[in-house]
Amino acid sequence: MATRTQFENSNEIGVFSKLTNTYCLVAVGGSENFYSAFEAELGDAIPIVHTTIAGTRIIGRMTAGNRRGLLVPTQTTDQELQHLRNSLPDSVKIQRVEERLSALGNVICCNDYVALVHPDIDRETEELISDVLGVEVFRQTISGNILVGSYCSLSNQGGLVHPQTSVQDQEELSSLLQVPLVAGTVNRGSSVVGAGMVVNDYLAVTGLDTTAPELSVIESIFRLQDAQPESISGNLRDTLIETYS
């Protein structure tokens, strides 16, 4: 399922939220429409946590995470950290990262298996990404851009990259990541796809300006047409087994 919304007149959904397969973070103080877009699709499948990071609302740009963990910058307050620990599932590791490039969401793009990172990220940060998120880490650029987190949106099903990414680069990245990639835009032609949308294995949320063709590319590359939360499909499977056994 792909859906469109806005955060206080901004279409940059990936700036104000973070979506993984086990949790969803949303910035505080948005309009009800913004929250209800997530609540309507996610229901009780995963927790939706209202938070700030380092006192800011740009939580999607400050954090990086997947179903196993969440990395936050060292400026994150103790209170914010405690709130996250109380709200996220116990299986999710939360780790402060001392990194000069503190907008982690701009310099890390990951799914549950691999991460692309800014070429100049600290060696210690690279090790933390690997340990906390349980992923293989590759230092990369996307179409010559070092802010890989801003110009790539990734799930375990597929990925959307900067529209000027060459076919050769797409193929190289695709074989690294082991998922199909497509070059495209969100929010009526914006190339900053990482900041313009969030996605997990069954839901994408983009800005209100996203056109129908852009939305259909997103639904197709992330295989969202009949996707549903694992917990729901798991329950359904159990029910079917019981019914037919």
From Swiss-Prot:
Subunit structure: Monomer. Associates with the 60S ribosomal subunit.
Protein name in the entry: Eukaryotic translation initiation factor 6
Domain of life of the native organism: Eukaryota
Pfam families to which the protein is assigned, alphabetical: eIF-6 (PF01912)
Additional remark text: Present with 18600 molecules/cell in log phase SD medium.
Localization: Cytoplasm; Nucleus, Nucleolus
Organism: Saccharomyces cerevisiae (strain ATCC 204508 / S288c) (Baker's yeast)
Modified residues (Phosphoserine): 174-175, 231
